[in-house]
Swiss-Prot record:
Belongs to the ScpA family. Component of a cohesin-like complex composed of ScpA, ScpB and the Smc homodimer, in which ScpA and ScpB bind to the head domain of Smc. The presence of the three proteins is required for the association of the complex with DNA. Participates in chromosomal partition during cell division. May act via the formation of a condensin-like complex containing Smc and ScpB that pull DNA away from mid-cell into both cell halves. This is Segregation and condensation protein A. Keywords: Cell cycle, Cell division, Chromosome partition, Cytoplasm. It comes from Mycoplasma mobile (strain ATCC 43663 / 163K / NCTC 11711) (Mesomycoplasma mobile). One of its GO terms (biological process) is chromosome segregation.
Length: 247
Protein backbone atom coordinates (compact mmCIF):
# COMPACT_ATOMS: atom_id res chain seq x y z
CA UNK A 1 0.00 0.00 0.00
CA UNK A 2 1.48 3.33 -1.06
CA UNK A 3 1.10 5.75 1.86
CA UNK A 4 1.26 8.75 -0.46
CA UNK A 5 -1.87 7.57 -2.28
CA UNK A 6 -3.64 6.59 0.93
CA UNK A 7 -7.26 7.71 1.43
CA UNK A 8 -8.97 7.37 4.82
CA UNK A 9 -12.38 7.52 3.16
CA UNK A 10 -11.84 3.89 2.17
CA UNK A 11 -11.92 2.84 5.83
CA UNK A 12 -14.50 2.88 8.63
CA UNK A 13 -12.15 3.90 11.41
CA UNK A 14 -8.73 3.08 12.90
CA UNK A 15 -9.56 -0.55 13.68
CA UNK A 16 -10.64 -1.06 10.07
CA UNK A 17 -7.32 0.41 8.91
CA UNK A 18 -5.31 -1.82 11.26
CA UNK A 19 -7.18 -4.93 10.07
CA UNK A 20 -6.41 -3.93 6.48
CA UNK A 21 -2.70 -3.63 7.30
CA UNK A 22 -2.76 -7.08 8.94
CA UNK A 23 -4.47 -8.48 5.83
CA UNK A 24 -1.86 -6.85 3.55
CA UNK A 25 0.86 -8.63 5.51
CA UNK A 26 -1.02 -11.93 5.14
CA UNK A 27 -0.53 -12.39 8.87
CA UNK A 28 -2.68 -13.75 11.68
CA UNK A 29 -3.95 -11.39 14.37
CA UNK A 30 -2.42 -13.57 17.08
CA UNK A 31 1.07 -13.65 15.51
CA UNK A 32 1.37 -10.15 14.01
CA UNK A 33 4.42 -8.09 15.02
CA UNK A 34 2.70 -5.24 16.84
CA UNK A 35 5.74 -2.94 16.71
CA UNK A 36 5.97 -3.36 12.93
CA UNK A 37 2.21 -2.83 12.57
CA UNK A 38 2.43 0.33 14.69
CA UNK A 39 5.30 1.65 12.55
CA UNK A 40 3.34 1.21 9.33
CA UNK A 41 0.19 2.75 10.82
CA UNK A 42 2.12 5.77 12.13
CA UNK A 43 3.85 6.30 8.76
CA UNK A 44 0.44 6.51 7.10
CA UNK A 45 -0.91 8.95 9.70
CA UNK A 46 2.20 11.14 9.40
CA UNK A 47 1.65 11.52 5.65
CA UNK A 48 -2.01 12.52 5.82
CA UNK A 49 -2.76 15.70 3.91
CA UNK A 50 -3.89 18.76 5.86
CA UNK A 51 -7.37 18.47 4.40
CA UNK A 52 -7.80 15.16 6.17
CA UNK A 53 -7.04 16.41 9.69
CA UNK A 54 -10.67 16.67 10.84
CA UNK A 55 -11.48 13.26 9.40
CA UNK A 56 -8.45 11.75 11.11
CA UNK A 57 -9.21 12.70 14.74
CA UNK A 58 -10.14 9.15 15.78
CA UNK A 59 -7.11 7.85 13.86
CA UNK A 60 -4.87 10.16 15.88
CA UNK A 61 -6.26 8.73 19.12
CA UNK A 62 -5.25 5.25 17.96
CA UNK A 63 -1.86 6.62 16.85
CA UNK A 64 -1.25 7.92 20.37
CA UNK A 65 -2.11 4.50 21.77
CA UNK A 66 0.30 2.76 19.38
CA UNK A 67 3.09 5.26 20.12
CA UNK A 68 2.65 4.58 23.83
CA UNK A 69 2.84 0.80 23.35
CA UNK A 70 5.72 0.93 20.85
CA UNK A 71 7.81 3.29 23.00
CA UNK A 72 7.57 0.96 25.98
CA UNK A 73 8.38 -2.07 23.84
CA UNK A 74 11.54 -0.40 22.52
CA UNK A 75 12.71 0.58 25.99
CA UNK A 76 12.45 -2.92 27.43
CA UNK A 77 14.72 -5.93 27.00
CA UNK A 78 13.29 -8.03 24.11
CA UNK A 79 13.15 -11.03 26.45
CA UNK A 80 11.10 -9.12 29.00
CA UNK A 81 7.58 -7.81 28.77
CA UNK A 82 6.12 -5.24 31.10
CA UNK A 83 2.73 -6.21 32.59
CA UNK A 84 1.19 -2.90 31.47
CA UNK A 85 2.42 -3.43 27.89
CA UNK A 86 1.00 -6.94 27.94
CA UNK A 87 -2.37 -5.58 29.06
CA UNK A 88 -2.31 -2.82 26.40
CA UNK A 89 -1.44 -5.33 23.66
CA UNK A 90 -4.16 -7.73 24.82
CA UNK A 91 -6.72 -4.91 24.90
CA UNK A 92 -5.80 -3.79 21.37
CA UNK A 93 -5.93 -7.38 20.11
CA UNK A 94 -9.33 -7.83 21.77
CA UNK A 95 -10.63 -4.67 20.06
CA UNK A 96 -9.38 -5.91 16.67
CA UNK A 97 -10.99 -9.33 17.12
CA UNK A 98 -14.28 -7.78 18.24
CA UNK A 99 -14.24 -5.37 15.30
CA UNK A 100 -13.58 -8.25 12.91
CA UNK A 101 -16.65 -9.99 14.35
CA UNK A 102 -18.60 -6.77 13.95
CA UNK A 103 -17.66 -6.61 10.25
CA UNK A 104 -18.90 -10.17 9.81
CA UNK A 105 -22.26 -9.18 11.34
CA UNK A 106 -22.38 -6.18 9.00
CA UNK A 107 -21.68 -8.44 6.02
CA UNK A 108 -24.59 -10.70 6.96
CA UNK A 109 -26.87 -7.68 7.29
CA UNK A 110 -25.84 -6.49 3.83
CA UNK A 111 -26.64 -9.93 2.43
CA UNK A 112 -30.08 -9.82 4.05
CA UNK A 113 -30.62 -6.32 2.70
CA UNK A 114 -29.63 -7.52 -0.79
CA UNK A 115 -32.12 -10.38 -0.61
CA UNK A 116 -34.84 -7.98 0.56
CA UNK A 117 -34.08 -5.61 -2.34
CA UNK A 118 -34.91 -8.37 -4.83
CA UNK A 119 -38.50 -8.60 -3.59
CA UNK A 120 -40.78 -6.73 -5.98
CA UNK A 121 -43.29 -4.31 -4.46
CA UNK A 122 -45.89 -2.66 -6.67
CA UNK A 123 -45.56 1.13 -6.87
CA UNK A 124 -48.51 3.18 -5.57
CA UNK A 125 -50.96 4.25 -8.27
CA UNK A 126 -50.24 7.92 -7.59
CA UNK A 127 -46.51 8.05 -6.82
CA UNK A 128 -46.38 11.83 -6.31
CA UNK A 129 -48.73 11.56 -3.37
CA UNK A 130 -46.23 9.38 -1.52
CA UNK A 131 -42.99 11.06 -2.60
CA UNK A 132 -40.91 12.96 -0.11
CA UNK A 133 -37.26 13.98 -0.13
CA UNK A 134 -35.13 12.08 2.36
CA UNK A 135 -31.67 12.48 3.76
CA UNK A 136 -30.13 8.99 3.83
CA UNK A 137 -27.68 10.05 6.55
CA UNK A 138 -30.47 10.60 9.08
CA UNK A 139 -32.72 8.27 11.05
CA UNK A 140 -36.45 8.88 10.76
CA UNK A 141 -37.85 5.91 12.66
CA UNK A 142 -38.25 3.86 9.48
CA UNK A 143 -34.60 3.44 8.45
CA UNK A 144 -33.42 0.08 7.12
CA UNK A 145 -31.04 -2.08 9.13
CA UNK A 146 -27.91 -0.97 7.24
CA UNK A 147 -28.64 2.74 7.70
CA UNK A 148 -29.33 2.11 11.36
CA UNK A 149 -26.16 0.06 11.81
CA UNK A 150 -23.92 2.64 10.10
CA UNK A 151 -25.39 5.57 12.01
CA UNK A 152 -25.19 3.80 15.37
CA UNK A 153 -21.63 2.62 14.65
CA UNK A 154 -20.48 6.18 13.85
CA UNK A 155 -22.17 7.45 17.00
CA UNK A 156 -20.55 4.65 19.03
CA UNK A 157 -17.07 5.45 17.67
CA UNK A 158 -17.52 9.18 18.28
CA UNK A 159 -18.65 8.69 21.89
CA UNK A 160 -15.81 6.34 22.81
CA UNK A 161 -12.89 7.37 20.55
CA UNK A 162 -11.37 9.75 23.10
CA UNK A 163 -11.47 7.02 25.77
CA UNK A 164 -9.54 4.39 23.80
CA UNK A 165 -6.34 4.96 25.76
CA UNK A 166 -7.78 5.63 29.19
CA UNK A 167 -10.41 2.90 29.39
CA UNK A 168 -9.44 -0.49 30.73
CA UNK A 169 -12.02 -2.77 29.14
CA UNK A 170 -13.04 -5.71 31.28
CA UNK A 171 -14.91 -8.76 30.04
CA UNK A 172 -18.63 -8.04 29.82
CA UNK A 173 -20.93 -11.03 29.63
CA UNK A 174 -24.27 -10.04 28.17
CA UNK A 175 -27.02 -11.75 26.19
CA UNK A 176 -29.94 -10.39 24.12
CA UNK A 177 -32.60 -11.26 26.72
CA UNK A 178 -30.65 -9.42 29.40
CA UNK A 179 -30.19 -6.35 27.18
CA UNK A 180 -33.91 -6.24 26.29
CA UNK A 181 -34.79 -6.19 29.99
CA UNK A 182 -32.14 -3.54 30.71
CA UNK A 183 -33.41 -1.29 27.89
CA UNK A 184 -37.03 -1.64 29.04
CA UNK A 185 -35.91 -0.83 32.59
CA UNK A 186 -34.25 2.35 31.26
CA UNK A 187 -37.57 3.46 29.75
CA UNK A 188 -39.30 2.73 33.07
CA UNK A 189 -36.69 4.86 34.85
CA UNK A 190 -36.26 7.78 32.42
CA UNK A 191 -39.58 7.90 30.58
CA UNK A 192 -40.46 7.57 26.90
CA UNK A 193 -37.08 8.79 25.56
CA UNK A 194 -33.61 7.46 26.42
CA UNK A 195 -30.40 8.94 25.02
CA UNK A 196 -27.70 7.01 23.16
CA UNK A 197 -25.08 7.11 25.92
CA UNK A 198 -27.34 5.43 28.47
CA UNK A 199 -28.10 2.47 26.18
CA UNK A 200 -24.61 2.08 24.69
CA UNK A 201 -22.93 2.45 28.08
CA UNK A 202 -20.12 -0.13 27.68
CA UNK A 203 -17.27 0.67 25.19
CA UNK A 204 -16.90 -2.76 23.58
CA UNK A 205 -17.83 -3.94 20.10
CA UNK A 206 -19.44 -7.12 21.49
CA UNK A 207 -21.77 -5.08 23.72
CA UNK A 208 -22.50 -2.76 20.78
CA UNK A 209 -23.41 -5.62 18.39
CA UNK A 210 -25.73 -7.33 20.88
CA UNK A 211 -27.40 -4.02 21.79
CA UNK A 212 -27.74 -3.09 18.11
CA UNK A 213 -29.46 -6.40 17.28
CA UNK A 214 -31.77 -5.97 20.27
CA UNK A 215 -32.74 -2.46 19.09
CA UNK A 216 -33.48 -3.86 15.63
CA UNK A 217 -35.76 -6.47 17.20
CA UNK A 218 -37.56 -3.90 19.36
CA UNK A 219 -37.99 -1.60 16.35
CA UNK A 220 -39.35 -4.54 14.32
CA UNK A 221 -41.89 -5.20 17.10
CA UNK A 222 -42.73 -1.48 17.02
CA UNK A 223 -41.79 -1.02 20.66
CA UNK A 224 -39.31 1.76 19.83
CA UNK A 225 -38.26 4.14 17.08
CA UNK A 226 -34.89 5.83 16.51
CA UNK A 227 -34.74 9.47 15.48
CA UNK A 228 -31.77 11.62 14.38
CA UNK A 229 -32.71 15.16 13.39
CA UNK A 230 -29.42 16.08 11.70
CA UNK A 231 -26.23 14.37 10.55
CA UNK A 232 -23.89 13.73 13.51
CA UNK A 233 -26.71 14.81 15.82
CA UNK A 234 -27.73 12.96 18.96
CA UNK A 235 -29.67 9.75 18.35
CA UNK A 236 -32.93 9.64 20.30
CA UNK A 237 -34.37 6.24 21.21
CA UNK A 238 -38.09 6.65 21.80
CA UNK A 239 -40.62 4.21 23.22
CA UNK A 240 -43.77 4.01 21.11
CA UNK A 241 -46.83 4.96 23.16
CA UNK A 242 -49.46 2.33 23.81
CA UNK A 243 -47.06 -0.62 23.48
CA UNK A 244 -46.81 -2.88 26.52
CA UNK A 245 -43.58 -4.71 27.26
CA UNK A 246 -43.63 -8.43 26.61
CA UNK A 247 -42.85 -10.37 29.75
Amino acid sequence: MNKFEFNLENFDGPLDLLLSLVKDKKADLFTIDLADLATQYLEIINHLEDSNVDVASEYLVMAATLIHIKAKMLLLNPEEEDEEIKEDKEMLLKQLIEYQQFKEVAKKLRQQESIRSEIFIKDPSNYDEYYRETDETLLDGRSNSLSLMNTLRKMFERVHAENLRQTKIEAVHVNPEQRIKEIRDLFDEFGEEVDFAKIFNVPTITHFVITFLVLLDLARKQEIKLIQDKEFGEIRIIKIKGVENEQ
